[in-house]
């Protein structure tokens, strides 16, 4: 009887992780499309303020955010007609590395604030997407990397921080992901 309970509990945990990842991916795609609908190309230019990137904060609370955000980015970039040819691969790789890094560094804080983790998406996206932009549209790697980093850091340090503190203040980290 005990082994059945454990196996069922393990299955519930796997199912919960899969469901969380799927919901996060769907939210990412929906938010990005909605933003692009309201303000065309605001989520796809070199200096982009992709509101959905604030969801990267979820990687501080659950490992399900790693595949969820990676797949969400992949789905949007594949489905967006204006995406660069390799953006589905490069952008998704940047999301994977950033969210995995965020999850691994989530306990490194400054007075309870996970600054390092919140900056990782800016770093990975700047390096990878900055390179991709330089390859396809030119303008220089460092300038493109700077543009990407500015947009990414702005979203994570504002909207991402607000989301982080809202989740913590309402103890939703335990309720939603516990």
Report the location of each language-model feature.
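Membrane-interfacial loop-to-transmembrane alpha-helix junctions, especially the N-terminal start
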Residues: 64-66, 114
């Amino acid at each position: 009887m005990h082994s059945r309970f454990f196996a069922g509990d393990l299955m519930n945990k796997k199912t919960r992780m899969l469901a969380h990842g799927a919901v996060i991916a769907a939210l990412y795609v929906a938010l990005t499309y909605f933003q692009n609908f309201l303000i065309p190309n605001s989520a796809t230019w070199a200096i982009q303020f992709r509101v959905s990137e604030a969801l990267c904060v979820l990687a501080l609370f659950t490992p399900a955010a790693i595949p969820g955000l990676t797949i969400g980015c992949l789905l949007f970039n594949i489905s967006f007609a204006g995406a660069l040819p390799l953006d589905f691969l490069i952008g998704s790789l940047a999301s994977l590395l950033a969210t995995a890094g965020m999850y691994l560094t989530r306990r490194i804080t400054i007075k309870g604030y996970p600054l390092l983790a919140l900056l990782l998406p800016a770093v990975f996206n700047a390096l990878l997407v900055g390179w991709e932009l330089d390859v396809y549209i030119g303008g220089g790697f460092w300038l493109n990397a700077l543009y990407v980093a500015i947009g990414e850091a702005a979203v994570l340090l504002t909207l991402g921080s607000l989301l982080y503190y809202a989740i913590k203040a309402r103890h939703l980290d335990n309720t939603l992901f516990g």
